[in-house]
Regions:
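Sec/Tat signal peptide C-region and signal peptidase I cleavage site
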Residues: 15-19
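Sec-dependent N-terminal signal peptides
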Residues: 4-13
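Outer membrane beta-barrel
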Residues: 21-34, 44-160, 262
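Exposed loop/turn and edge beta-strand positions of beta-sandwich/beta-sheet ligand-binding modules
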Residues: 51, 86, 98, 137, ...
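Transmembrane beta-barrel domains of outer membrane proteins
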Residues: 56-58, 93-95, 101, 142-146, ...
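Loop-centered beta-sheet repeat module
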Residues: 153-200
């Protein structure tokens, strides 16, 4: 299967030579590292890891229609029910006019929060809420309305995060605002109705906020969840905070932590608990260094811990980008 994927990429490169005016950006990206962990019994383990190997491509079909592809090359590309298992993005975005747009294809399931919105290759450890969502990408459609260049509202109908195959009759109905309240306050807010198995459903209100002051930014995500199962309503919430300092675009130092009260994804959208815990607390921090003038090479050192696994983790690693087409 991997040979087929690489062959398709080679075809894309051949096409790009003749039609580079339609491809604005294409690149490989990868992340690898050395992972160390110590549990509460002082048992030590370490190993090298290959975390991500992706291919991304951006371009335009016409002046009003753009597209994006992101393929994970180190993930099983096909499953029995989902031939796009390793494909995060495969969509086109039609700008109908200055206000309206339509996105169709495999895309992000719009759930509010800045942590959730990050590309996985840029996240070293997750909150309980994000870590247990079965999938963050699905096939669907999103109608967007732009109030101005900094504020867009999406109405999205897409496969549910709990729909693990294309044959499931599970959908998610999402209303999401990607916005900017002021020069120092950005938002990713959403309200979601998510279908689960066995006639269960989830309701999210997810409020992601980013506050920027000089070389600092603070991200604060708050998510309220209601699990509507056959017996009663289950209310839970999650909070994630991240404080980052940037030094001359060469170094980022951050701390990040959060708390989940009875994480909804441990309850899942099912009748029985899934790895149920009363609560989930995590914290950590790290440093990223960019030795080149651009951001194509990144070195990192990160520490993190959570009270579910009860392991102290220290990662050293590198992320790099190999550009194929860049305009």
């Amino acid at each position: 299967m991997r040979k087929i994927t690489l062959l398709l990429l080679a075809m894309c490169f051949a096409i790009s030579i003749k039609a580079q005016n339609h491809i604005s950006n294409a690149f490989f990206e990868a992340r690898a590292g050395f992972h160390n962990e110590i549990n509460d019994n002082n048992k030590y383990h370490n190993h090298f890891t290959g975390d991500f190997f992706n291919f991304q491509m951006f371009g335009n079909i016409t002046d009003n229609i753009s597209y994006r592809v992101r393929q994970r090359l180190n993930k099983n590309p096909f499953t029995e029910d989902n031939i796009f298992n390793a494909t995060d993005f495969l969509y086109f975005d039609w700008k109908i006019n200055d206000k309206w747009s339509l996105m169709v294809g495999k895309q992000e399931i719009f759930i509010g929060g800045f942590e959730y919105d990050y590309a996985p290759i840029d996240v070293y450890y997750w909150s309980g809420f994000c870590n247990e969502i079965p999938q963050s990408y699905g096939i669907g459609a999103a109608l967007g309305y732009s109030f101005d260049k900094d504020n867009i509202l999406y109405l999205q109908i897409i496969n549910s995060p709990f729909s693990l195959g294309n044959k499931d009759d599970l959908l998610s109905y999402n209303l999401a605002w990607f916005g900017k309240v002021s020069d120092w306050w950005k938002t990713i807010w959403s309200t979601n109705y998510v279908q689960g198995e066995k006639d269960n459903s989830l309701f999210y209100v997810a409020l992601g906020n980013r506050f920027e002051i000089n070389d600092f930014y603070l991200e604060a995500d708050i998510t309220q969840t209601i699990n509507n199962n056959e017996d009663d309503l289950k209310y839970t919430y999650a909070f994630v905070g991240k404080l980052n300092y940037n030094y001359r675009d060469k170094l980022d130092a951050f701390i990040k932590g959060g708390y989940d009260k009875e994480p909804i994804c441990y309850y899942s959208a099912y009748n029985t608990p899934f790895n149920y815990v009363d609560n989930y607390t995590f914290w950590g921090g790290g440093v990223e260094y960019f030795p080149l003038k651009n951001k194509d090479l990144r070195l990192h050192c990160v520490y993190y811990y959570n009270d579910k696994d009860k392991k102290h983790n220290i990662d050293f690693g590198v992320t790099w980008k190999l550009n194929v087409v860049r305009k």
